[in-house]
Amino acid sequence: MPPAARAQVDLTAHPLPGILTPGPGSANVIIGFFPAWRGISLAAVAALQTAKAAADTAVAAAQGTPGFAAAQVSAAASMSTAISAAAGLADKHMCATPFPPTPHGVGVDITGSATVQINFLPAGRQGDTILEALGPPNTISKGELTVLIGG
């Protein structure tokens, strides 16, 4: 069972900012003095992955053309909208790792626990995948070792 993830303190694989932020995390579930991190509803994951695949295909098709930067900006905008709509009250991570000309952008935990919920959302854990608007997926690389969350 992986350690529980928390907003504002636990690490991500991408270096900028390197922690799960802005969150905000659960207002009433505190793990190791920090708010618990929550993923998106598992029912919303498939649609979000389909939108991400379409955005990635559009960006890849534009690579090496004068329209590459515009394709990235367009993909970032459409994915940010899709992520925000799918997220609802789930926690959002803002990745500033550059994917020139724009950063990876907003992302959400798409592999949260299927058996443990926090505020009716899947509990976030170390090793979970964060799908971001641009670029490759991110992962939660550190959680609270004293709280383990299953499935």
Residue ranges and their predicted role:
Residues M1-G151:
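Intrinsically disordered, low-complexity proline/glycine-rich segments
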